[in-house]
Structure formats: C-alpha cells, structure tokens
Design a protein with these regions (language model features):
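Basic, ligand-binding patches in group-transfer machinery
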Residues: 1-90
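Class I (Rossmann-like) S-adenosyl-L-methionine-dependent methyltransferase catalytic domain
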Residues: 88-145, 156-202, 224-229, 245-335
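Nucleotide donor/acceptor-binding cores
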Residues: 147-149
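Class I SAM-dependent methyltransferase core
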Residues: 152
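A short acidic, Gly/Pro-enriched loop at the edge of an enzyme's catalytic core
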Residues: 201-213
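A short SAM/SAH-binding and catalytic strip from SAM-dependent methyltransferases
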Residues: 212-225
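A short glycine-rich, Lys/Arg-flanked "PGG" loop and its adjoining helix->strand segment in the class I
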Residues: 228-240
C-alpha cells in the first residue's frame, strides 16, 4: 500500500492485488470508516491476475492511523496494516521549498523519467534524499566544508544534487549519461560543474579528484557485469580516505516488483536474493537517453554488498531502506 497527499486536500492509496477472473470492486476504509470512492479494477492480462488500484479520499494523510483496502461484497481483505508514515510522499515544506527560490525546475518530462510525476513530488523527494546524504557526509567528515569536492555520479537533473548544492557550500560536481539532464543543470545551476559521462567507464576525471562520490539509483539499474568495474572507477576518482555513498535496491524493493508484476520479477522471493546475492533483469525504456539495452532493474542483498564490494573498497556501514524507505544506502571508503 502506498499513499500520498495530493495538494494537501486528499489522500490516495494505490497498490496491487491478486484478483480472480472477474473485475473486483475495491473499497478503502480508514480508521474503521469507509471513505472515498468504490472503484472497479480489471485484472491486467499481462500481469496474470494482478490488478492495480488507486483510491482517493479527502483526508490529510498525517491523520490516518490505519487503512485497509478490501473487495466489496466478499469482504476479502487486500491490505490491513498500520499506515506507516514512511510510505508517505508529503508535499514540500517551507524548508524544502527554500532551495527552489529563483531556480528553474527541470522540464516535467525529465522529472517523470525518475519517478517524480509532479514538481512538488520532485522537490519533496529531493529534499528528503538530500537530508539523508547530508547526514552521511556529516557523519564521515564532521561537517560539509566549502573545500570538499563532491561528485554526484548519475546525477540526472539533480533531484538530490540541487538541494545539497543550494543548501551547503562545497565544490559540487555532477555527471550523467543523459545529455538533456546535464544541459538543464548547466543552464539552471551553473555553480554545479556538470558533465556528460559515458554508460561504461572511465569517468572524465583524473585520479584522486574527489573527497566524496555520491551515487543514487544507479546500481539499482546496472547489469551485474558493470557493478565492480564502476565501483573500481569510483575508487579511482576518490582521494585516499575519501567517502562513497551508493544506494541499492534490496529485498523490500524486490518484493514490490514481484507484487507489481514487473517482467522477470513475478516469481522471485527474498530467499532467491539471499541465495544469489544480486539479481538483474534487463529492460529498455526508449525514453532514457544515453543507456543501452542492458539497462534494467537490479536488486542486491546487503550481505552480498558487504562481502563482494569490500574487495574494491571497505563497506563501513549499510543503512537499510534509508532512502524513501526503499533503497539501502552504503558508506564506503578508499584506503
């Protein structure tokens, strides 16, 4: 179950359910009261008997304690659990919005490529991710000093890089395979040194260039054969004693993909990831610039990251589901 506030006036709950052959009537109940719409959802042929649902009701999400979705008539329950705040995508606060003042936000089509359907979601997600990364930087360095050279590898349109750079003085750099994203950053935020990079190593930087390299939602898509070469490339451009903050998708995200019916993930379970260590399934989105047909979805078992990645750089710490309550964040260093 996933919920968010839309324009601060209504809440939407969306998710996936296993249905029969017929359409199902879905009802949302919040704190014991049936609210909102009752809506029919047709099972999708391409997803087996999975059917998606999205139900809206006019109640701020922060007041919701418990929510469930069930089939009308039979009363078969699809969701019945505490409505956990970590699933919220809240509207940006005043503090979130401060870094956007005077900034030209990216084109909506570029936001949608990274899963931000509306500008307020882009701002809120970027702000929260930047907060987590700030905490990691401060934990390692003690503070974010203006002299720190920090690279966001796979920065895209700067969803987390922009709030970091506009809140904290440092020498900020970004690189990405998407030339449209880099053109936007160079136009909207020239204080960030952004460059186009290739889909495969090397990066366009000398050895020992950076005190820190951040990489969010990159290893979540790379094919397995590129994991260690790119990790070695990150190590190359880091100075000795530098920090790498890299995110991966773990068992939780794999379960989401399975329930959602993502091709290649329908029959995978956490024990499969535990056994394999890392699982990858290719897909090619024609709207993505700069990637090849090997671009896909990847899941990592945290123990695999600790064991295998440490052959390149020691993994100091893993924070499970640290980013948007979905992706794991790994802290590595170059000895």
């Amino acid at each position: 179950m996933h919920g968010y506030i839309d324009s601060c006036t209504r809440t939407e709950i969306s998710g996936w359910a296993i249905a029969g052959e017929e359409a199902v009537e879905l009802v949302v109940e919040v704190d014991g009261v049936v609210v909102g719409q009752v809506r029919a959802a047709e099972p999708r042929a391409d997803l087996g008997r999975n059917c998606g649902f999205r139900l809206a009701f006019a109640r701020p999400l922060e007041t919701v304690k418990k929510a469930r979705v069930y089939c009308a008539g039979a009363g078969e329950e699809l969701v019945n659990s505490p409505f956990e705040p970590r699933y919220q995508v809240l509207p940006p606060s005043a503090a979130d919005l401060a870094w956007t003042h005077g900034l030209e936000l990216p084109p909506l089509e570029q936001m949608r490529l990274i899963g931000s359907d509306r500008p307020e979601i882009f701002v809120a997600q970027g702000s929260r991710t930047a907060d987590v990364l700030r905490d990691g930087l401060c934990e390692f360095f003690g503070d974010i000093q203006p002299s720190l050279r920090i690279l966001d590898f796979g920065c895209g349109v700067g969803r987390s890089l922009l709030p970091l750079a506009r809140r904290h003085a440092a020498l900020w750099h970004g690189c990405d395979v998407n030339n449209h994203a880099i053109a936007y950053l160079n136009r909207a935020a020239p204080e960030i040194k952004a460059r186009v990079s290739l889909y495969e190593p090397p990066l366009p930087f000398p050895d020992d260039s950076f005190d820190c390299v951040i990489s969010i939602s990159v290893w979540t898509h790379l094919p397995i054969g590129m994991h260690l070469p790119w990790l070695a490339e990150i190590r190359r451009v880091l100075r000795r004693g530098g920090l790498a903050l890299i995110s991966t998708s773990g068992p939780y995200v794999m379960n989401v993909r399975r329930r959602r019916g993502d091709p290649g993930w329908e029959h995978l379970h956490p024990e499969d990831l535990l056994e394999a260590g890392v699982i990858y399934r290719a897909y090619k989105n024609p709207d993505l610039t700069g990637v090849t047909a090997s671009y896909g979805l990847t899941a990592h078992d945290p123990a695999h990251v600790q064991r295998v990645w440490s052959t390149i750089m020691p993994v100091l710490k893993t924070s499970v589901r640290a980013l948007e309550s979905t992706q794991d964040l790994h802290m590595l260093t170059k000895l």
